[in-house]
């Protein structure tokens, strides 16, 4: 049997040696040729023992051909759908007797050959419709011209074809073990561990094998190329390969066959018009999110743990054994599993009028419950975010009544209802963990537990007023009379904004500071917000040194809030 690597070479060969049998495969030359994928790209001739890729426009058939020169030849043809179900059939036409005997070596005139050839639809050997990887296998095939016709009726599609006359020795696809199932051996909220039996192709035959795991949320895949096709969807139209050279009546004449004129022109007309129509009507397909499907190749390990999954989510897992020498793969029987739910968090009970300290992990959540004993008309909720911003959600008897991002101190007024219960959810930021102080109260009027803050909590330093032993700073106040305490701390020359940001915990009060760091405390307010500014000169500093200044405002109940820290430096020479 001979399957040539290109149509042009095949026609020249037959023209030159009309009366002789086609030569058998030169293995050394074949191995060199199959490495050159361009020789087989979009060719209508199927090479012996090499996998080729193709592309179909919807409703537009493609035909591939090969010749088996001797009777009783083993034959294997495998078709792998990638994007969509395919319909394919394999037919056989016997070689004309005058082409199989010994000849003079001189080609006959073309017109005379046409008169000797009659149209023949051939014998149908195998048909299939679906998206499985399917094969035609025969231990003893007759000689003749074989035609493989493929069509996709759903959409434009990629596919792969492999065929060989030496299936016993080639074995390009990794062999599945006796138990080809993928097992889930461990299941967590964000992790799944998979295990499978190794392929004998690697463990027994010593072929180079690696395993690739595909994870997605939709369904299992029957081939690796189907998974890769899903991953490679673009934000633009799918790009098809350029049309290649198809067989013409001239080619068939020298094989000893010719299709009828009507069939040939009808196919040409339908192919051209369908292809044009499909090019114009192909739909825009958005690219799936990266997280929706992943492919991870892990070498020759047969146990693998997938991490960073979402809790309470169903995933589908497929394992493919890939022969890295041939780049051909075989699918194990895939599986699916649902990750475990998030552990239900303990709900913290809030007491009326009492401050509760809360810690929330990075990107984590904490739930608080407030159930006033007496009937109430209003609930006042104070939230003091000490570090990064947090999201606050409040539900009253299951109904969402508040959803806000909170930085610093915020106060919310919620309308009350008799016997109402409130569920408060605090969600941490992506940056880091959060510490909060939370207070809920039904008591109307009275002094507030947290001090009022101005919109701007920065401390301003006056550069022109710096000396070798003092600095002058200012900060904004409010219309509420509060106590302000100033603290200083000497820091190194390398101390920068990153250090300051890391230490910016607004909930740490003056009680956390050393007595030696205290500068002063004073009361301050202004009925006119435009004039609610106070200044202070801090003395007793050393020349050329850096200091971190902090201002704390203390509320009536003793709760304090820290302004943004300020880094200052005294003059070195005066």
Curated annotation (Swiss-Prot):
Signal peptide: 1-19
Keywords, in A-Z order: Glycoprotein, Neurogenesis, Repeat, Secreted, Signal
Domain Fibronectin type-III, residue spans: 174-329, 451-560
Disruption phenotype: Morpholino knockdown of the protein alters the migration of gonadotropin-releasing hormone (GnRH) expressing neurons.
Example GO BP: cellular response to fibroblast growth factor stimulus
Disulfide pairings: none
Gene Ontology CC annotations of this record: extracellular region
Disordered, as annotated region: 97-118
GO molecular function: heparin binding
Compartments, record wording: Secreted
Top-level taxonomic group: Eukaryota
Main location: secreted
Carbohydrate attachment residues: 327
Coiled coil spans: none
PANTHER family named in the record: NEURON-DERIVED NEUROTROPHIC FACTOR, PROTEIN NDNF
Protein function: Secretory protein that plays a role in various cellular processes. Acts as a chemorepellent acting on gonadotropin-releasing hormone (GnRH) expressing neurons regulating their migration to the hypothalamus. Also promotes neuron migration, growth and survival as well as neurite outgrowth and is involved in the development of the olfactory system. May also act through the regulation of growth factors activity and downstream signaling. Also regulates extracellular matrix assembly and cell adhesiveness.
Protein name in the entry: Protein NDNF
Higher taxonomy: Eukaryota, Metazoa, Chordata, Craniata, Vertebrata
Gene: ndnf
